[in-house]
From Swiss-Prot:
Family statement: Belongs to the CinA family.
Protein name: CinA-like protein
Domain of life: Bacteria
NCBIfam families: cinA_nterm, molyb_syn, PRK03673.1
CDD domains listed in its UniProt record: cinA
One Pfam family per UniProt: MoCF_biosynth
Species, as recorded: Escherichia coli (strain SMS-3-5 / SECEC)
SMART domains: MoCF_biosynth
Length: 400
């Protein structure tokens, strides 16, 4: 199997001052192309360290994606490191220099002399175009390893990988068939509880069951070779059966996006009133393009479940909304949820059984509970659901 590695560069990445989203994206993207990463390394802006690791990985990896260090400043060292590792000099790529000058001219700017550095590549390098920025990429062969050098700006990096690097890999190597990866996301059951229920399932050869906990959800993944796809699809039915009503969506689209699509297809507008969640619901649904009619964040106040149910019913009527959803204030470890619909208003009062979680985590969990309440109503399910340390202590329905 082709041994593919990634090298992230930059002091800000090494020291945790920024999150390396490029590495996460590349690992996921390459995995679904049949090119799982076998190793990831991070090195700061130090020429000796960069040269050392390039020479080291050139003895082990077939392909190395180097990210970052192609800018115009003194701490951008990737091109010089590549040239030094190969024992050659840098040469000016005249065509890219002209392209950069055109790039700045079209934007009414004068190119700084420091940008000239971005057109200096190792003498043996293969030029790689960057259609969306000033940092071109390049490729060099060092010992057994084909190395691709890419810009750190995420939008530029992704375009280069998808449109320049992946086609080159397909030309030069015989790539394996992408693996099959089936995913679903659950809410309300713990990772250990799900694992205990699923451990008895017999997995086909080469197939693995994975769990990823990210408060407040658990993702289940069934991954295996394409040759086992039929057996995996059959097993997936058992996985969904065992997970039961804790399943909130399949795939990677996300619950807000699926709710948004369902609301649009059924021509339901939605109004929101949030206290404890502080606008988190509105943010998630608006980003997903949900048909939101009105949203408000109001100060927390102590109220009974009946009060929450009645005022969200009135709010739906006043706004002529298809649906209205409310999350009340948090008082004495209790919280109210209410959903006003054409079929009536459904309300739940829940109790937190622990105080060990932060405010942010509690808000995330409650936002997901509210979304799940909406999802369950849209799917003609009982709206009540619990989540480990959150217990439903009261429910009520107001008829139309």
């Amino acid at each position: 199997m082709l041994k593919v590695e990634m090298l992230s560069t930059g002091d800000e990445v090494l020291h945790g001052q920024i999150v390396d989203t490029n590495a996460a994206w590349l690992a996921d993207f390459f995995f679904h192309q049949g090119l799982p990463l076998s190793r990831r390394n991070t090195v700061g802006d130090n020429l000796d360290d960069l040269v050392t690791i390039l020479r080291e990985r050139s003895q082990h990896a077939d392909v190395l994606i180097v990210n970052g260090g192609l800018g115009p400043t003194s701490d951008d060292l990737s091109a010089l490191a590549a040239a030094t590792a190969k024992g050659e000099g840098l040469v000016l790529h005249e065509a890219w220099l002209k392209e950069m000058e055109r790039y700045f001219h079209e934007r009414g700017r004068v190119m700084a002399p420091s940008n000239r550095k971005q057109a200096e590549l190792p003498a043996s390098a293969e030029f790689i175009n960057n259609p969306v920025g000033t940092a071109c990429g390049f490729a060099v062969q060092l010992n057994r390893c084909l190395m691709f050098f890419t810009p750190g700006v995420p939008s530029e990096f992704k375009v280069m990988v998808e449109h320049e690097i992946l086609p080159r890999l397909r030309e030069r190597f015989s790539l394996p068939q992408p693996p099959v990866c089936l995913r679903l996301t659950t809410f309300g059951r713990s990772e250990s509880d799900l694992a205990q229920s699923l451990d008895s399932l017999q997995l086909p050869p080469g197939v693995t069951m994975g769990y990823r906990s990210s408060m407040p959800i658990i993702e289940l993944k069934l991954t295996g070779p394409a040759s086992e796809e039929q057996a995996m699809e059959k097993l997936w039915l058992d996985v969904k059966r065992v997970a039961g009503q804790s399943v909130i969506f399949e795939g990677t689209e996300g619950l807000p996006a699926q709710i948004s699509r369902e609301l649009q297809s059924r021509q339901f507008s939605l109004t929101l009133s949030e206290q404890f969640t502080g606008g988190l619901l509105a943010l998630q649904l608006s980003r997903a393009g949900a048909p939101l009619l009105a949203c408000e964040v109001v100060p927390s106040q102590e109220e009974t479940l009946a009060q929450t149910a009645h005022w969200i019913t009135e709010r739906r009527a006043n706004h002529f909304a298809g649906l209205a959803l409310a999350v009340s204030g948090f008082e004495n470890e209790h919280l109210n949820f209410a959903l006003a619909t054409p079929d009536g208003t459904f309300a739940l009062r829940v109790r937190f059984s622990t105080t060990r979680y932060s405010q942010a985590i509690r808000q995330e969990v409650c936002a997901m509970m509210a979304l799940n309440m909406l999802r369950r109503w849209l799917n003609d399910q009982d709206i009540a659901s619990e989540h480990g340390w959150i217990e439903v202590v009261e429910s009520m329905t107001l008829s139309v």
